[in-house]
Amino acid sequence: MAFTWDNQEKLRILQPETEITISQATSKYTPMKKQELYHKVIDYFEQTMPVAETELHYNNPFQLLVAVILSAQCTDKRVNMVTPNLFRDFPDPETMAASNPDVLFDYIRSISYPNNKAKHLWGMANMLVNEYHSEVPSDLDQLVRLPGVGRKTANVIQAVIFEKAAMAVDTHVFRVSHRIGLVPARCTTPYSVEKELVRNFPAELIPKAHHWLILHGRYTCIARQPKCDACGLVMICKHYQNQHKLSAQPCPQTGTVHNKSKKEKGQNKS
């Protein structure tokens, strides 16, 4: 559940020849309707992140599939370091299928779990050649049959390549969705988060929303010590409210004043 401010007090700020009145939020909140919350989130990201795309480097569907398989529990930056040589020598399913896992391993040894991923790449390439005419399928059930491809990877391919209303839920999407109240606390699995997001985002925005949430989680709403000062969603963020209960510091985006948290009070003792 997200929140808006209620039970407001007045804080007066004097400036030369001007008296400005702004709202001071207290600890009492009222629920925000779900669609209102989603509209606020969409408006914010449309303004701050009008272009939101995958950071993986690729030139065709096969290369994106390879890159996404490699990105499991690995950073996009690391994947982008190894794929140029890999794509140079194995530009398509046929050349990769004609190789073997041991050879592929040498190209991806700096990636997490290189042994398993080398086997997955080789198996995936063989299945594409033998069963799908060397084409990456668009159907979810066909995609998840490929070695190394789970629901998350399949949804990335569907959204990015085929522009389908598919929401891939990784750790960033999961974290951000809960923090800003896009999904209820009962959504404890990636699948339940996926269904809730797909249900509430407009279908045409789902592929873009996937990247909004990933990039926001990767660079701003990070797992530890999120950069709340750089975030325009703190007013609807449950995590921010929980961390700043009884805080006497102004909200970074609005100037709203809260009392200091117990942790902050302890740090300020002389």
Language-model features and meaning:
Residues 6, 13, 21-22, 28:
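Short, positively charged and aromatic/hydrophobic N-terminal segments
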Residues 29, 33-250:
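Catalytic cores of DNA base-excision repair glycosylases
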Residues 242-270:
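Short microdomains enriched in Cys/His and/or Lys/Arg
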